[in-house]
Structure formats: structure tokens, C-alpha cells
């Protein structure tokens, strides 16, 4: 059973949940992380123990929440889901922990956003399965230890570097999720289309995968939008031409760049001479949060060689200039003699 301790989900969230695989066998990609988890889960089940605490990190949309739910399904236990910003006070976390049952999975998304005070409650809970409760105030205050059922904490984060060392060290399993290949995404898109009762041609699935930035969440989102286009203008069949026409209207180019990707790169190239330029300066220039640029847009641009992150700031690469048809500037020549 899944219990979500977060605000109500939207219709798109509910639809996204129906597309998620329910077992490791159905989960596509992330072979290294999946293979390790399969071994750890089988070993824990064989010993009749709770799975060790798991930290999943990587760019958004790669399947961290899906893996957390699969872990619970494979272990045959309940999962309770929440997120770091929702847990504002130690009492909030204490209430969640005391309602867990033996071997339950507690999933905390954006775990890097837990406050330091809340983290302090987690340390003994993760290590000793105990909750330290302070009764009274001032000199008469005393601490009692409340035993907790053995549970598995699954934490997800896009910014593992922001986790404190004491918290990170308490995770027994740490897995990084990588961007997906075009072949993996095409398989996911075909599977999602089948679940949604849609007909999609192989070349249409491949083209959609190519423009999905290596991210299943984006692939499924674009699939839903292309489905609308196919339903209205193409008899409900998703072909290569349908995908190309629909994504042209959505301003998604052949590399998967959307409006914001183009804004980031063109701002660096046209306004700041290709860089280096600071992240906060870019954010101010395009009216976007610096955290959003760093977490959502930069990983894809950097991994695909369009952006460099240097100590002095962000720099557009030769590939970025060529993508937009800009002339690549010549590197400055050093002077032989000083004036």
C-alpha cells in the first residue's frame, strides 16, 4: 500500500503514476543501480530483514520515485511518501516515524532540503531505530528513547552534494541514476503508448526519444502532448511526421532543446560573449531561479557538451555556437611584447 504525505496530486501526476513500472523486471534502464538493488533486496528478504537505507541521486525525472515504490513492492511492504520541504518541524518527522510498521519504506523526496534540526531526529532513527524525545523544559527536561520498528529510508535528491556528511554516511546503499539512451527511451515510450491505448510507429517513438533529453518524465510528458495532436489531426496514429509537426509547435528542436535551453545558451553567447559568466547573472538575465537552471537545465547541457562549468562561470562550447549557427570566436592571442 502507498500512502502519500504530500499535497494532492494533479491529473497529470495521476496519469504519470499509471505509466510507472511496478517491478524491477518492468523497469527499463539504470542497469547498474537496478542490478545492485536486485541483489540487496533478495538478500534482505532471504534474511527476513529490512533493506538497508537507500539514497538515490541524479537529475530530475530519471525514476527515483519510481524506484522507491518498486523497492517497497519487491520487499512486499508498505511505502509512505513525503518530501523534505513538507517536514518543517521535528514533530512532523516524529509523527511519521511512529506510524511506520515493521520493514516499511519511508520515501523522502528532496531530502537535501531537510532542516538541520529535523536531520538530528533522523540520525538515531536510521542507525539505532530509536527516537529521542525531550520531555519538559529547562533544568527539569529529560530525554527518553522510543523504539521504532526496523524500516528502510529511501532518500531522493538532485543535489547529493548538499547532504550533510552524517546523513549521507548513514545510507548503506547509494546509487546514482544516469540519463537514458535513445533506445531505452523509445522502449519506455512504446510501453507508455500501449498503456494509454495509442498506436505509435517505431520511427515516431525513436524521434520522440531523441528529443526527450534522456529523461523518461519528459518522454512521457511529450508523448501525452503528441497524443493530443495525433488525436485531432492524424487519426490517432503517432507517426514520424506527427511527432515532428507536434514538437515543432511545442518549440522542441531536434536536440530536445526547449525555449529555456535556448534562452540560457543564447544569453551566454549573445549577451556575454560566450562566457565565462556567473550563474546568478544568467538567472537575472533570463528571469529564472538559479537553482532551477542548475538542477533542471544544466545537467543535460553539460553532459551533451553544450556548456562548460568553470571556476570563473559558465562557458558556451563550440557545439553550442554551431547548433545555433553562430560563428565560433577565435581564442585570444597572447602578446609577445607588453605595451
UniProtKB/Swiss-Prot annotation:
It catalyses: ATP + H2O = ADP + phosphate + H(+). ATP binds at residues 19-20, 61, 64-66, 127-129, 170, 180, 217. Its EC number is 3.6.4.-. It is an enzyme of class 3 (hydrolase). Residues 181-251 are annotated as: Small ATPAse domain (RuvB-S). Its main location: cytoplasm. Residues 254-339 are annotated as: Head domain (RuvB-H). Mg(2+) binds at residue 65. The keyword Ribosomal protein does not apply. Signal peptide: none annotated. Residues 1-180 are annotated as: Large ATPase domain (RuvB-L). GO terms for molecular function: ATP binding; ATP hydrolysis activity; four-way junction DNA binding; four-way junction helicase activity. GO terms for biological process: DNA recombination; DNA repair. The keyword Hydrolase applies. One of its GO terms (cellular component) is Holliday junction resolvase complex. InterPro entries: AAA+_ATPase, AAA_lid_4, DNA_helicase_Holl-junc_RuvB, P-loop_NTPase, RuvB-like_N, RuvB_C, WH-like_DNA-bd_sf, WH_DNA-bd_sf. Homohexamer. Forms an RuvA(8)-RuvB(12)-Holliday junction (HJ) complex. HJ DNA is sandwiched between 2 RuvA tetramers; dsDNA enters through RuvA and exits via RuvB. An RuvB hexamer assembles on each DNA strand where it exits the tetramer. Each RuvB hexamer is contacted by two RuvA subunits (via domain III) on 2 adjacent RuvB subunits; this complex drives branch migration. In the full resolvosome a probable DNA-RuvA(4)-RuvB(12)-RuvC(2) complex forms which resolves the HJ. NCBIfam families: PRK00080.1 (NF000868), ruvB (TIGR00635). The RuvA-RuvB-RuvC complex processes Holliday junction (HJ) DNA during genetic recombination and DNA repair, while the RuvA-RuvB complex plays an important role in the rescue of blocked DNA replication forks via replication fork reversal (RFR). RuvA specifically binds to HJ cruciform DNA, conferring on it an open structure. The RuvB hexamer acts as an ATP-dependent pump, pulling dsDNA into and through the RuvAB complex. RuvB forms 2 homohexamers on either side of HJ DNA bound by 1 or 2 RuvA tetramers; 4 subunits per hexamer contact DNA at a time. Has 3 domains, the large (RuvB-L) and small ATPase (RuvB-S) domains and the C-terminal head (RuvB-H) domain. The head domain binds DNA, while the ATPase domains jointly bind ATP, ADP or are empty depending on the state of the subunit in the translocation cycle. During a single DNA translocation step the structure of each domain remains the same, but their relative positions change. HAMAP family: DNA_HJ_migration_RuvB. This is Holliday junction branch migration complex subunit RuvB. It comes from Geotalea daltonii (strain DSM 22248 / JCM 15807 / FRC-32) (Geobacter daltonii). The gene is ruvB.
Amino acid at each position: 500500500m502507498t500512502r502519500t504525505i504530500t499535497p494532492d496530486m494533479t491529473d497529470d501526476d495521476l496519469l504519470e503514476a499509471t505509466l510507472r513500472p511496478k517491478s524491477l523486471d518492468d523497469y527499463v534502464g539504470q542497469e547498474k543501480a537496478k542490478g545492485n538493488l536486485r541483489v540487496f533486496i533478495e538478500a534482505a528478504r532471504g534474511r527476513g530483514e529490512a533493506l538497508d537505507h537507500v539514497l538515490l541521486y541524479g537529475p530530475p525525472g530519471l525514476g527515483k520515485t519510481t524506484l522507491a515504490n518498486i523497492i517497497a513492492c519487491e520487499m512486499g511492504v508498505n511505502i509512505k511518501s513525503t518530501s523534505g520541504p513538507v517536514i518543517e518541524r521535528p514533530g512532523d518527522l516524529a509523527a511519521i516515524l511512529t506510524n511506520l510498521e515493521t520493514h516499511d519504506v519511508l520515501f523522502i523526496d528532496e531530502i537535501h532540503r531537510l532542516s538541520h534540526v529535523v536531520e538530528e531526529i533522523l540520525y538515531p532513527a536510521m542507525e539505532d531505530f530509536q527516537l529521542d524525545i525531550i520531555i519538559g523544559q529547562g533544568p527539569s527536561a529529560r530525554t527518553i528513547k522510543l523504539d521504532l520498528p526496523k524500516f528502510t529510508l529511501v532518500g531522493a535528491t538532485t543535489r547529493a552534494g548538499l547532504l550533510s556528511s552524517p546523513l549521507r554516511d548513514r545510507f548503506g546503499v547509494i546509487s546514482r541514476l544516469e540519463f537514458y539512451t535513445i533506445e531505452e527511451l523509445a522502449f519506455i515510450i512504446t510501453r507508455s503508448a500501449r498503456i494509454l491505448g495509442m498506436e505509435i510507429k517505431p520511427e515516431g517513438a525513436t524521434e520522440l526519444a531523441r528529443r526527450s533529453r534522456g529523461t523518461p518524465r519528459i518522454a512521457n510528458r511529450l508523448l501525452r502532448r503528441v497524443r493530443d495532436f495525433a488525436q485531432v489531426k492524424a487519426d490517432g496514429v503517432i507517426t514520424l511526421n506527427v511527432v515532428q509537426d507536434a514538437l515543432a509547435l511545442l518549440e522542441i528542436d531536434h536536440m530536445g532543446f526547449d525555449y529555456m535551453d535556448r534562452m540560457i545558451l543564447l544569453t551566454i553567447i549573445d549577451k556575454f560573449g560566450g562566457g565565462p559568466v556567473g550563474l546568478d547573472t544568467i538567472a537575472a538575465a533570463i528571469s529564472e531561479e538559479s537553482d532551477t537552471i542548475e538542477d533542471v537545465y544544466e545537467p543535460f547541457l553539460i553532459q551533451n557538451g553544450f556548456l562548460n562549468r568553470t571556476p570563473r562561470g559558465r562557458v558556451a562550447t563550440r557545439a553550442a555556437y554551431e547548433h545555433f549557427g553562430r560563428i565560433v570566436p577565435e581564442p585570444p592571442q597572447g602578446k609577445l611584447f607588453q605595451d
